Amino acid sequence: MNIVYRVLDAPINPETLARHRQHKIVLESATTSQTKGRYSVVAFDAYGEVILTEAQLNILTPHQTLQETTAPFEQLKAFVGQYHAHISEPELEALPFISGFAGYCSFDLVRHAFPVLQQYPAAGTTHDIHFYMIESVYVFDHYKEQIYVIATNLFSKASENELYERLDEMIAEFDQIELFETTQVPDLPEKVIEPNIDEATFIEQVQQFKGRIQQGDMFQVVPSRIYRYAHHFGEQLHPLTYQLYQKLKRNNPSPYMFYFNMGGPILVGSSPESFVKVKAGKVMTNPIAGTIKRGATDEEDQQLAETLLSDEKELSEHRMLVDLGRNDILRIARPGSLELTKLMTIERYEHVMHIVSEVIGDVDPRLSPIDVIASLLPTGTVSGAPKLRAIQRIYETQPLKRGVYSGGVGYINCDHTLDLALAIRTMVIDETHVHAEAGCGVVYDSVPEKELAETQLKAKSLLEVTL
């Protein structure tokens, strides 16, 4: 792979650059942490697309369209695995993403990793994986106030001269940007939120799950509910959804912010939680369970943190998720390399603090990035425990594909480092509706009406920021 790049003093911010193009991918962080908020990544053009459904792998590029129906999951692993390039320059190696695959893996990818789940029907047309093949990016370094403009030939095999021509075109984008005003929001009718499962049915489902738990079938399960409303954005769909993303970033800042608008359904997300990372040969997952608001003063903040760390119910749930994370990492790590590097520490964000742990291991070099993702997907946070049994019960009781919700959103870099957020607090927007999904953790003493209210509260906190 050839790489050409230039480093420029940032003439604009990511919002201004991204706003002037209809189709784009934006990956950034809205936290104030130095390690999590340093970079923003913006990409406009994809060389191709990789789409996995339950029965077929589709690979779409300018030169070919491939449809594989024989062992599509294995074909996907081989296809992604072949695009592996070493980054020799330390300056570029430090950046989160310079080229590779960006997109999402759905909750339902688990049906490929565990074929036993395919006996359970799951209605829906969502893709199990949808990746865009990215060769050109703008990476904003907010601490140095610089932009890395990067062009590669990871997929296209373009010549070095062609790469420099592409780089010049990317830099010329800055001169084409007009500092226009934000799109005027039209008068929209009052939102009528439509859940996919009515209240009585959902309460009955929670009762069924409780019965299973009380019989010893599982410890916890996380059912979900989809909420949607008609948005009436019309011809302003693209600028208004990006405006919505910016509003979400202001009102609900999170470590993982993402906006995908590349011609299909639009993803807008503000996730507080990492799903999986791979860096320098290490695979890492961060179980999060236990949340409390931030205090108004330092003293109150510390008192609230101590209250959270003394809540045995929260600690018990957190330990269970740590055990699930250890089991998931064990399947893909070198023997003896598993480490619990953080155990039940407090991580503070703008409005809340969480109990967070960290499990890492050395990645088995024989595995592809897709092996790593499929081994951990979905996390226990959004499925339950034991994980496979909980997922079986979810599909039995709610025979629908979850799609993006509770899957992973992010990237696989060309050097096979990767970083995916857990796809919660995520909206899927099509030409007519905004969709948001929310779940609740059902345990032996859950109150069904309270679990229903939890899904309503989570969905409302996301949908209330919409225009």
Descriptions of predicted regions:
Residues 1-467:
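Extended alpha-helical targeting/anchoring segments
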